[in-house]
């Protein structure tokens, strides 16, 4: 294709080049050429002016389940200084208040933790509206019990008596292999499963763990129907703030959820490459990897830095 450029567009009234207009045009070229720009040298600050709202993943971007990354907190502070909004949007299968408490114990300020919104909270709203009186079988660890605290009397121990399945993760004593869930679920594919975390895996420090999404995938492969809550599905974006016509950048380390969610919503995206996909990125051409996942990534950064 051919683009004609009037250089006067980039100049202000005093004939000085307008840096903001140049940056906007640079972003435009990256978009139409489907190029991924690496921000490791320039930092997020090089493109932050262009956006009004930032959806930022928690696990793998802000913390690793054990410690908070200092550079990511600097990013949040700088976004605030620019009078722009950020939302810490996470596929955690628990209510907002539980996850906020969890990261505060790691040292997060309450002012920052108040920006946390979870897939569990989105699922909870749906469950209270549609399934509050129905009996369910819970698949997941005890730490997720807070999700259904207001209707815990409907939780039953016998899966055969359940009207629906609520999946928040894996049982603590069955969290290494998925074959157990194939046997557990095969006779119950006519029931609906509500999955509160579409993520397939997560890294807790240096240990990789299965998430609820892996169990839901087993259920779907058996022929069951799953109602998902969390990225990449749209409901989770709308629970936290009014988007209106604001320019949005989604930041995360997961191509299946963070980046695909941005693509579904027509938002720009930044992939943190030293996260879930770090080994795949090392072993593959980055463009081929994105093609394999069928996603478009606008920016790449090894770790979130300003």
Q: Over which residues does each language-model region extend?
A:
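Non-core capping and flanking segments associated with repeat-based/extracellular domains
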Residues: 22-25
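Extreme N-terminal basic, low-complexity initiation segments
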Residues: 2-9, 16
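Conserved nucleotide-binding/hydrolysis micro-motifs of P-loop NTPases
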Residues: 94
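Asp-based, Mg2+/Mn2+-dependent phosphohydrolase catalytic module
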Residues: 28, 32-70, 74-81, 89, ...
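Short hydrophobic targeting helices and cationic amphipathic motifs
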Residues: 7-10, 27-29
């Amino acid at each position: 294709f051919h683009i004609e450029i009037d250089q006067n567009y980039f100049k202000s009234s005093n004939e000085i080049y307008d840096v903001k207009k140049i940056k906007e045009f640079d972003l435009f070229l990256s978009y139409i050429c489907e190029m991924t720009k690496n921000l490791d040298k320039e930092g997020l600050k090089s493109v932050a002016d262009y956006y009004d709202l930032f959806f930022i993943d928690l696990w793998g971007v802000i913390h690793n389940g054990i410690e908070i990354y200092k550079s990511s907190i600097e990013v949040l502070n700088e976004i605030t200084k620019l009078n722009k909004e950020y939302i810490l949007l996470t596929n955690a299968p628990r209510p907002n208040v539980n996850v906020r408490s969890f990261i505060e114990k790691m040292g997060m300020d309450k002012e920052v933790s108040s920006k946390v919104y979870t897939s569990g909270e989105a699922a909870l709203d749906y469950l209270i509206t549609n399934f509050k009186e129905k009996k369910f079988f819970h698949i997941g660890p005890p730490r997720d019990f807070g999700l259904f605290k207001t209707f815990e009397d409907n939780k039953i121990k016998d899966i055969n008596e359940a009207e629906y399945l609520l999946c928040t993760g894996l049982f603590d004593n069955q969290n290494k292999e998925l074959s157990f869930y194939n046997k557990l679920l095969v006779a119950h594919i006519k029931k609906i499963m509500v999955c509160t975390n579409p993520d397939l895996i997560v890294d807790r420090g240096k240990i990789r763990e299965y998430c609820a999404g892996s169990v839901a995938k087993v259920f779907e492969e058996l022929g069951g129907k799953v109602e998902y809550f969390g990225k990449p599905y749209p409901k989770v974006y709308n629970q936290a703030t009014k988007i209106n016509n604001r320019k949005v950048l989604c930041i995360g380390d997961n191509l299946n959820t963070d980046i695909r969610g941005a693509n579904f919503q027509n938002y720009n995206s930044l992939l943190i490459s030293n996260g879930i996909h770090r080994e795949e990125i090392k072993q593959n051409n980055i463009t081929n990897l994105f093609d394999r996942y069928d996603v478009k990534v606008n920016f790449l950064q090894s770790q979130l830095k300003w």
